[in-house]
């Protein structure tokens, strides 16, 4: 184990009542389990290599190749023993050229569901070390996934074995079943390591990063997770919630007793695609929306991250090409006195538009006005994403234009929210292409 068991137990306050260790090898971890108070009879070992399994003298050794289904497979035995797998070697041959297959054995796999049920195994700690087949083993747990509090598993970030699951796939599968990756130790050059997944309790506390647009992403993602899994957990939120007077949704205030999610940005449009009606119901407005026949050019300088010198007049000149005719035009900015706001104002006026800068208002009022404005033009921010989505879901004729450029920061945001799978409720404008 690359991560010492004692550190896992201490960090996450786990009390072991039993262990299921899949990929026993020489049972090297036995002393560590005993040191944590687990009785020898409550430790179960599964080993696919029959020659190794025969040499093990501990109780509860089960000779079996584990997978997600019962099927005949070829078990590849390597010269070092530890790299043997039901999957063929792939990049492993590059990373560890000294390791090679010396023999093969035809085997019928078993599922962990069958193994646990037939032997009456009671364990809350699962250790997987089966060379790329870890996700297959997890999928074969069936309902017994619910008896585990911790999953310690080998993980891969490159395809060391043909068809092996990579780390993001394990994250996704376990997260949807209430487990969160809390610690990872990797041999980066080799593409493999170990990870610890801990079951969360029924109260999740979002330690949010970002601003309100990203908060909406995080809260919506958690609520969709709650709906999809049927788990009755409560979402707490430690940030000040700025939309309480506008939206009916109000998350509970954060609490230290809740399981804390310290995650990256939820900024992937694909997780909401096809679930728009659920989003509309979740983030319902307190008062009926009324469309306003106006155009708002949104300039939040924080989204441009001081790249205004690189953007120069290219941004406002692109905006001018997409302004509607015969509609009042306003610039909205949290920093109305910023020189770049005045540069944009001047460019738009020179193009013949009567445009003004709106006075600064509360965030709630600005958000509501952006949603209700018929036309909104803005940068690739999370705020504009939600303005466009919620506006389109509630008001017919809502038009949101999102301006993209390599000179804008957070290129990953432009991809996950916009260009990878363009949202139906936004028109994308590529400044770099002269659009």
Q: For each predicted feature, which ranges?
A:
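Donor-binding and catalytic core of enzymes assembling or modifying cell-surface/extracellular glycoconjugates
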Residues: 212, 327-419
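A short acidic, amphipathic alpha-helical/loop segment
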Residues: 8, 32-36, 55, 136-144, ...
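Short, aromatic/basic amphipathic alpha-helical patches
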Residues: 56-58, 165-174, 242-254, 338-351, ...
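Secretory-pathway luminal glycosyltransferase catalytic domains
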Residues: 205, 233-327, 336-338, 420, ...
């Amino acid at each position: 184990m690359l991560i010492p068991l004692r550190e896992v137990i201490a960090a996450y306050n786990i009390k072991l009542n039993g262990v299921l260790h899949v990929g026993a090898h020489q049972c090297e971890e036995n002393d560590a389990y005993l040191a944590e108070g687990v009785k020898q009879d409550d430790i179960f070992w599964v080993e696919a290599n029959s020659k190794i399994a025969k040499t093990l003298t501990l109780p509860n050794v089960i000779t079996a190749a584990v997978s997600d289904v019962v099927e005949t497979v070829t078990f590849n035995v390597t010269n070092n023993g530890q790299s043997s797998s039901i999957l063929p070697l792939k990049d492993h041959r590059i990373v560890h050229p000294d390791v090679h297959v010396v023999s093969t054995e035809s085997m019928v796999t078993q599922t962990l569901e069958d193994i646990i049920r037939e032997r009456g195994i009671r364990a809350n700690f699962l250790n997987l070390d089966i060379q790329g087949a870890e996700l297959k083993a997890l999928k074969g747990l069936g309902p017994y996934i619910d008896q585990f509090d911790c999953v310690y598993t080998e993980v891969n970030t490159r395809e060391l074995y043909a068809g092996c699951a990579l780390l993001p796939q394990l994250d996704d599968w376990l997260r949807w079943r209430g487990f969160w990756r809390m610690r990872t130790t990797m041999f980066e050059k080799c593409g493999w390591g170990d990870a610890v997944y801990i079951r969360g309790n029924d109260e999740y506390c979002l330690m949010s990063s970002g601003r309100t647009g990203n908060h909406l992403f995080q809260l919506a993602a958690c609520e969709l997770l709650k709906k999809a899994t049927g788990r009755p957990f409560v979402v707490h939120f430690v940030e000040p919630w700025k939309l309480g007077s506008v939206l009916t949704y109000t998350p509970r205030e954060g609490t230290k007793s809740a399981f804390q999610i310290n995650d990256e940005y939820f900024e992937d449009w694909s997780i909401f695609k096809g679930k728009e009606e659920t989003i509309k119901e979740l983030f319902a407005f307190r008062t009926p929306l009324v469309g306003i026949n106006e155009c708002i050019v949104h300039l939040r300088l924080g989204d441009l991250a001081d790249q205004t010198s690189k953007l120069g007049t290219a941004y406002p000149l692109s905006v001018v090409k997409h302004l509607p005719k015969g509609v009042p035009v306003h610039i909205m900015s949290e920093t109305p006195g910023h020189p770049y706001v005045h540069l944009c104002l001047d460019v738009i006026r020179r193009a013949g538009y009567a445009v003004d800068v709106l006075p600064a208002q509360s965030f709630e009022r600005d958000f509501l006005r952006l949603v209700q404005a018929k036309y909104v033009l803005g940068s690739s921010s999370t705020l504009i994403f939600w303005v466009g989505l919620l506006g389109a879901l509630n008001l017919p004729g809502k038009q949101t234009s999102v301006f993209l450029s390599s000179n804008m920061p957070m290129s990953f945001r432009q991809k996950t929210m916009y260009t990878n799978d363009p949202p139906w409720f936004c028109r994308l404008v590529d400044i770099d292409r002269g659009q």
